[in-house]
């Protein structure tokens, strides 16, 4: 069971702390026996808060699609299993989701040509200031936003990356359109943190939700970096699986 203590002096609203704990309890299967979140009065007693605070937490979780109020019954869990996303030598979004979802969606939010900054230049092995193609994207499974990413590609080699991605909806296919038929994952760093305002909006999360951020580099088979990405996954919808 998830610890029910909330901290009144930690700078995070009580309802957000409670929403986090209920979200984790749902994820852990603590309420699976009934399929219902405990009554508001019970939650208020467990957390040591009033019912209004509990209602605010449940309303936030309802906005995420995690729970649903049912008249005369209480709050029902709309539990959807996390999809398992493998990180391996050949990491591909659509192949990674496999048969876990019926429909995979990708959206190009924006693109630009930008100069390589220090960290990104180092990751791609290019001098600072080198022109890069920047893509901002959101990916979903069965209509649920799963991740949002900002990715960078050497502009000299992948000049049409934005146009190809917009048309094909796939990084792998956009690479192939530039003559790159295969590429591999070189490195992946993973951190977990609270979602920022833009991520809450793009992933349709409530305040206090957690994202897992990966910073990754892909390279061609000769070892030349071709992509640097910063991807944020909704932690209550995706679990990352490291394959070696």
Curated annotation (Swiss-Prot):
InterPro entries on file: Bact_HTH_transcr_reg (IPR050679), Chorismate_lyase_/UTRA_dom_sf (IPR028978), CP_lyase_PhnF (IPR012702), Tscrpt_reg_HTH_GntR (IPR000524), UTRA (IPR011663), WH-like_DNA-bd_sf (IPR036388), WH_DNA-bd_sf (IPR036390)
GO MF term (any one): DNA binding
Gene3D superfamilies: Chorismate lyase-like, Winged helix-like DNA-binding domain superfamily/Winged helix DNA-binding domain
Ranges of the DNA-binding region feature: 40-59
GO BP, sorted A to Z: negative regulation of DNA-templated transcription
SUPFAM superfamilies: Chorismate lyase-like (SSF64288), Winged helix' DNA-binding domain (SSF46785)
Protein known as: Uncharacterized HTH-type transcriptional regulator RB1450
Keyword list, A-Z: DNA-binding, Plasmid, Transcription, Transcription regulation
Domain HTH gntR-type: 12-80
Cited CDD domains: WHTH_GntR (cd07377)
UniProt cross-references to PANTHER family, sorted A to Z: MANNOSYL-D-GLYCERATE TRANSPORT/METABOLISM SYSTEM REPRESSOR MNGR-RELATED, MANNOSYL-D-GLYCERATE TRANSPORT_METABOLISM SYSTEM REPRESSOR MNGR-RELATED
């Amino acid at each position: 069971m998830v610890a029910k203590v909330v901290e009144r002096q930690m700078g995070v609203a009580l309802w957000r702390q409670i929403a986090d704990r209920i979200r984790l309890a749902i994820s852990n299967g603590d309420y699976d026996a009934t399929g219902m979140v405990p009554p508001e009065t019970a939650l208020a007693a467990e957390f040591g808060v009033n019912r209004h605070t509990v209602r605010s937490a449940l309303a936030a979780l309802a906005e995420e699609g995690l729970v649903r109020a049912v008249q005369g019954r209480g709050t029902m869990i709309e539990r959807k299993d996390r999809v398992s996303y493998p990180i391996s030598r050949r990491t591909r979004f659509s192949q990674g989701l496999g048969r876990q979802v019926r429909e995979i969606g990708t959206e190009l939010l924006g693109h630009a040509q930008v100069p390589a900054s220090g960290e990104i230049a180092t990751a791609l092995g290019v001098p600072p200031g080198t022109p890069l193609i920047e893509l901002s994207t959101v990916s979903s499974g069965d209509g649920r936003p799963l991740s949002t990413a900002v990715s960078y590609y050497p502009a000299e080699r992948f000049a049409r990356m934005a146009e190809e991605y917009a048309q094909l909806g796939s990084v792998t296919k956009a690479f192939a359109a530039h003559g790159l038929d295969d590429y591999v994952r070189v490195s992946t760093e993973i951190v977990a943190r609270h979602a920022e305002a833009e991520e809450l909006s793009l992933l349709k999360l409530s305040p206090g939700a957690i994202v897992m951020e990966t910073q990754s580099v892909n390279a061609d088979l000769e070892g030349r970096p071709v992509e640097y990405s910063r991807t944020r996954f909704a932690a209550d919808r995706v679990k990352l699986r490291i394959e070696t």
